[in-house]
Amino acid sequence: MAKLLQPPPKFLPSEWHIANKNQYHRADAQRSRSERLVAESQRLVDEIEKTTRKSQSDVNKKLEQRLEEVQFWKKELDDKLEQLVNVTDDLLIYKIRLEKALETLKEPLHITETCLAYREKRIGIDLVHDTVEHELIKEAEIIQGIMALLTRTLEEASEQIRMNRSAKYNLEKDLKDKFVALTIDDICFSLNNNSPNIRYSENAVRIEPNSVSLEDWLDFSSTNVEKADKQRNNSLMLKALVDRILSQTANDLRKQCDVVDTAFKNGLKDTKDARDKLADHLAKVMEEIASQEKNITALEKAILDQEGPAKVAHTRLETRTHRPNVELCRDVAQYRLMKEVQEITHNVARLKETLAQAQAELKGLHRRQLALQEEIQVKENTIYIDEVLCMQMRKSIPLRDGEDHGVWAGGLRPDAVC
């Protein structure tokens, strides 16, 4: 216990001075290190603050550039969308024009086919494959060809409208995404260090697995623009094609209509001329019938007129047979009476032969009269079919519209049918 209570060892003055100096040196060294650290820390703080400001400024510029780039593509898409919508609206109008043109063609085709059916009711020799029938068949073929062409063009227009709507959908979807992207980037661009809604986000520094590269992004929008341009150009070409088709087909059909009408007029003229000539011949035959009937009457009278002289001659001859004895002489009178009877008999035979010929000729004239009357009826039937039924009906074919230089009732232009 006494050992534990021993006083601490005493140091020498030199040791005391050395210990103090050591403390001074360590304090100076510690302070120097601290001062250097403070200075280094300040430089680090300044450097990082400067770097952060520069980085944030650079990010702001990049966001601003991105906003401008997205805005540029959004405007491009907006312009293409507007153009595509306008040309699609035009195509819808053209589609209606094609539909109306097809509907309008039904009447001319019906009229042409009806004319052909009517003309099948011609009779006799008039049931001929003439120029009118040839041109009517050609007109029907032209109309059917035009309808087939318009139907194909209508299908092309419908398909083009579908393609336009598909491109429009892609543009609208791209525009919608870009609008959202612009909104998001605009919010990001407006953020600053004093914004109230800034916060730390867990795992913010990451690449989304479904993200695309800038090149892919540019290709996507560029492809949408190119597709829209392609469909717009296709639509413009289709519009020009429809205009040409409607113009050319209407012009072709109008020309054929004129050809058919001219054929009808020429055919009617020929038929009427033939009818008039037949009527002239009928009139002459009727005159000849009347003349022949008078001739027959005269011949019959002449034959009847021979009965008196014949009876007289016969009576004289028979009476002279009663002369007595030698008076029953073959004298000159007897021979002359016999010759008279022979002459009368011969003349009556000649008259009867001529009468038979006249009666046969009269029958022939009556047969010719009936044939001419029947043929005139054939011509009248043809004239009625062509002039009354066909040509009157053809007047209802849609005509040229003077104000629009040939607009069809159904919208076909620039030339109408007839």
UniProtKB/Swiss-Prot annotation:
Disulfide bonds: none annotated. GO terms for cellular component: axonemal A tubule inner sheath; axonemal microtubule; microtubule cytoskeleton; nucleus; sperm flagellum. One of its GO terms (biological process) is cilium movement involved in cell motility. InterPro entries: Tektin-like, Tektins. It is found in: Cytoplasm, Cytoskeleton, Cilium axoneme; Cytoplasm, Cytoskeleton, Flagellum axoneme. Its main location: cytoplasm. Transmembrane segments: none annotated. Keywords: Cell projection, Cilium, Coiled coil, Cytoplasm, Cytoskeleton, Flagellum, Microtubule, Ubl conjugation. Residues 21-107, 134-177, 266-308, 333-384 form a coiled coil. It comes from the Eukaryota. Predominantly expressed in testis. Expressed in airway epithelial cells. Ubiquitinated, leading to its degradation. Deubiquitinated by USP16, promoting its stability. Belongs to the tektin family. Microtubule inner protein component of sperm flagellar doublet microtubules. Microtubule inner protein (MIP) part of the dynein-decorated doublet microtubules (DMTs) in cilia and flagellar axoneme. Forms filamentous polymers in the walls of ciliary and flagellar microtubules. This is Tektin-1.
